[in-house]
UniProtKB/Swiss-Prot annotation:
Region (Disordered) residue spans: 38-86
Protein known as: Intestine-specific homeobox
An example Gene Ontology molecular-function term: sequence-specific double-stranded DNA binding
Organism per entry: Homo sapiens
Source organism phylogeny: Eukaryota, Metazoa, Chordata, Craniata, Vertebrata
Function: Transcription factor that regulates gene expression in intestine. May participate in vitamin A metabolism most likely by regulating BCO1 expression in the intestine.
Main subcellular location of this protein, as a coarse class: nucleus
Name of a matching Pfam family: Homeodomain
């Protein structure tokens, strides 16, 4: 049959018949890991040298996000120069400064310059010292003003406890209620008065702390006197009136 058809066509038919029976060959990859590692590394866009006006993709992303990193390589000398140098005053300098502050809290430029030349300090340091001293003075004044009303309030609240020395305190209205009735005769009233109010009765002012005696002048009580009585047994009004009549 191959002679009739031809040798080329016969070989093709045999090849097709063999391909149907055999398993398909595995596709071979055109690259392998070993081949990739052996290849020379090509430069990427990240490693490409940039011109003075060009920005890399990393820098463009950082600038687009708005995040700026602080410079780490800032010299330490610049940091130290920002710190304020504290001035140590001597005793003589403090004495001169406090003397002027006692005279005036707000010295003008001429006084500050003269004082700075006298104590051998720059005028700016003298001005700063006066500012700090004024702040301390205002703070002390505020503390003093806050403490004064508290002391006054405590003194006003504290009242003397030993006011009643001779006995219970009786007001004038209470004494009027204890007075004998007017229907009794005068002699009975005298007896009641002598029996009811003994001779050792004492008069004390209603508020002893309000009256202060002045040396050389008679004492005048400016408030209503209060009778301090040690009450004796109460007499019976009926028996006294009956005996008097």
């Amino acid at each position: 049959m191959c002679a009739e058809v031809g040798p080329a066509l016969c070989r093709g038919m045999e090849r097709n018949s063999l391909g149907c029976c055999e398993a398909p060959k595995k596709l071979s990859l055109s690259f392998s890991i070993e081949a990739i590692l052996k290849r020379p590394a090509r430069r990427s866009d990240m490693d490409r040298p940039e011109g003075p006006g060009e920005e890399g993709p990393g820098e463009a992303a950082a600038s687009g996000s708005g995040l700026e990193k602080p410079p780490k390589d800032q010299p330490q000398e610049g940091r130290k120069s920002k710190r304020r140098v504290r001035t140590t005053f001597t005793t003589e300098q403090l004495h001169e400064l406090e003397k002027i502050f006692h005279f005036t809290h707000y010295p003008d430029v001429h006084i500050r310059s003269q004082l700075a030349a006298r104590i051998n300090l720059p005028e700016a340091r003298v001005q700063i010292w006066f500012q700090n001293q004024r702040a301390k003075w205002r703070k002390q004044e505020k503390i003093g003003n806050l403490g004064a009303p508290q002391q006054l309030s405590e003194a006003s609240v504290a009242l003397p406890t030993n006011l009643d020395v001779a006995g219970p305190t009786w007001t004038s209205t209470a004494l009027r209620r204890l007075a004998p009735p007017t229907s009794c005769c005068p002699s009975a009233q005298d007896q009641l008065a002598s029996a009811w109010f003994p001779a050792w009765i004492t008069l004390l002012p209603a508020h002893p702390w309000e009256t202060q005696p002045v040396p050389g002048l008679p004492i005048h009580q400016t408030c209503i006197p209060v009778l301090c009585i040690l009450p004796p047994p109460h007499p019976k009004w009926g028996s006294i009136c009956a005996t008097s009549t």
